[in-house]
Amino acid sequence: MLTARLTALLLAVLAAMPLMAEVGRPKVGLVLSGGGAKGMAHVGVLRVLEELKVPVDIVVGTSAGSAVGALYASGMEVQEIEERFIEMDWVSSFRDDPGRAYKPVRRKRQDWRYPVSPGIGVRMDGLHLGGGIIAGQNLGFILNELTRDAALVEDFDELAIPFRAVATDLETGEEVVIGSGNLSEAIRASMSIPGVYAPVTLNGRLLVDGGVANNLPVSVAHELGADIVIAVDITDPLLEREDIREAFSVVGQLTTMMTRQNTERQLKLLDDQDILMRPDLQGLSSADFYEAPALFELG
């Protein structure tokens, strides 16, 4: 069904292209929203675009969308993206433990006695928690591995497709568009869920998940010169009252409120020639990392 809808929309867009012939083919910008594990549905969308031979000139992503978008922009084939995502131990990204196989015997004994380490520290002025429950070391390892083929690229305009990742300045609340530097660090900043992962310091700014400021960065694609925007929105729906039961669900609900509000603002920027896609992901959550094949298909 999604393929048929996209085909119809693209045919309508292609029919309008002769009107722009004097200035050349219109630039197509692909915008991928955040959404945790549901971001793997973006890969299914990429597969459809690839099958339909839709040209993509600009890729912009927030949070999970930045991870998928970065790989696609770096020139990785969709099939390889799928394989990499299935192989990766995404659940380990929510731990800083590098795995028992890599630990000395002494650490293994400590872990057996003290299986949970909340990252609490003590200083002269009192008891302190870290910037997030998770420092993000394992997430960094995963992203380094995923982007190893583009590790030497510092200007994201030099990737196979120009790319931007969107993060949020924790001090000001402003969106930060990252277009240069280390690709894995840019993704890491864009995916730094507040309170879960420690913020990332990049170019002197303290950055967290881009979904806080701009979860569906249509405006960024327009600023980069996109004439046609294909926006894929997998923003979480708000929880029902009966599903808000503990602290994590409360925090999650507040985060969803913020992302939905800024997403609605971005949706108003879409023009008639733009395409909005909202894959039907009912029954799946932002934590369903083991459902990669199903998410690929639903995308």
Feature locations, PLM:
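Patatin-like phospholipase
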Residues: 2, 21-62, 70-298
